[in-house]
Amino acid sequence: VLKNVQLQTPMQVFAKDGLLINQFGEKRRIPVTIDQIPEPLLHAFLATEDNRFYDHIGIDPIGIVRSALVLISTGEKKQGASTITMQLARNFFLTREKAYIRKVKEIFIAIHIENLLSKDEIFELYLNKIELGNRAFGIGAAAQVYYGKELKELTLAQMAMIAGLPKAPSALNPIRNPERAKARRNVVLGRMLEEKYISRAQYDEATNQPITAYFHGAEIDLYAPYISEMVRAEMVSRYGIDKAYNSGFKVYTSVESDVQKA
């Protein structure tokens, strides 16, 4: 299943010359390959979510022992016992069962995923699948939704902000809760510093950056609502609303953008 996974991606409608007229879908997603992701962004997720990702087999015994010790000594459940692979297993395959049953299944599925995919394939799939708030799924969409940028254009502070979202995409949302998001961003930067992914100077500069996130809608190049509605209705008629909206269809019309603008 994971070797040929089809992520839910919105349908896009284009003019003849490739200008975007509209898009339809429940989720905003811009799939990216791992070689398109800036190294500091990869490091931000590793430092925050699973700093031993490239060393373990899908589960991290060291992380599990640490979490158990914290639970025994303080009574608090420590975040971080779930590896990136376990989170991927949860996102794809698991339902809302009792926590201990789900965790056991998570472990076995994670080990299976590690035998099926390479580490880079797992990491890439995770970064494209993960929910990051404001209907943004995957880091490509998050960069666009919060900053109106491509991944390569993000600052270190912005990358850390995005990497802090998986823990609680709504509660830590920089648009709705900027102060909580800033605190979480600085935690991410602190972990990057601890793991020696960034220098003290980079940490100081990034933690002093203001919150710059605000909502960016889809970048529509050509306003033609009548055309896009005709396409939408036809695609829904042919494929049904779920497949039409979530299969990543790119529909090119015969509309000439210069004529439409005139």
Region annotations inferred by a language model:
Residues 4-5, 24-25, 57-62, 81-82, ...:
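Short, glycine-/polar-rich solvent-exposed loops and beta-turns at beta-strand/coil boundaries
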Residues 76-262:
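Non-catalytic, structured segments within soluble enzyme domains
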Residues 20-23, 32, 53-56, 171:
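Short, solvent-exposed loop/turn elements at domain surfaces
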Residues 8-9, 13-22, 29, 38:
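Juxtamembrane extramembrane loops of integral membrane proteins
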Residues 25-34, 48, 107:
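N-terminal post-signal-peptidase region of extra-cytosolic proteins
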Residues 19-29, 64-67, 102, 241-242:
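N-terminal periplasmic "start-of-domain" segments of outer-membrane beta-barrel proteins
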Residues 1-13, 52, 72:
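N-terminal type II signal-anchor transmembrane helix
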Residues 33-84, 138-142, 147:
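Flexible, acidic/glycine-enriched loop-and-adjacent beta/alpha segments
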